[in-house]
C-alpha cells in the first residue's frame, strides 16, 4: 500500500495542476508517483484475483483454467 504521505502528495499535485499548473519538476514527480500508485494497485488486484473462485448458479466451479493454473503456481 502506498503511504499516506505519498497519497496526499498525489492529491496535492492533482489539485495544483487543475488550479495553477505544475512546474516541470512537479510534473515529473506526479508521473513517478502515479506510476508507483498504479504498480501497487495492480499488485493488489492480482493478489485479490488469485484468491477468487467462480461458482455458477448450480454450484459448479467454473473458474477459468488460466486462473486456476496461475493460482496453483503461486502455491508452490
From Swiss-Prot:
Presence of keyword Metal-binding: no
Basic and acidic residues: bias regions: 63-76
Claim: Ribonucleoprotein is one of the keywords in the record: no
Matches recorded under InterPro entries: DUF896 (IPR009242)
Any coiled-coil regions, as ranges: none
Family classification: Belongs to the UPF0291 family.
Matching PANTHER family: UPF0291 PROTEIN CBO2609/CLC_2481, UPF0291 PROTEIN YNZC
Listed name of the protein: UPF0291 protein GWCH70_1239
Lineage: Bacteria, Bacillati, Bacillota, Bacilli, Bacillales
Amino acid at each position: 500500500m502506498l503511504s499516506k504521505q505519498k497519497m496526499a502528495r498525489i492529491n496535492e499535485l492533482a489539485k495544483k495542476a487543475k488550479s495553477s499548473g505544475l512546474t516541470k519538476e512537479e510534473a515529473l514527480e506526479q508521473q513517478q508517483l502515479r506510476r508507483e500508485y498504479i504498480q501497487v494497485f495492480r499488485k493488489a488486484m492480482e493478489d485479490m484475483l488469485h484468491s477468487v473462485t467462480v461458482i455458477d448458479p448450480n454450484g459448479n466451479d467454473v473458474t477459468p483454467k488460466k486462473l486456476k493454473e496461475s493460482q496453483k503456481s503461486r502455491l508452490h
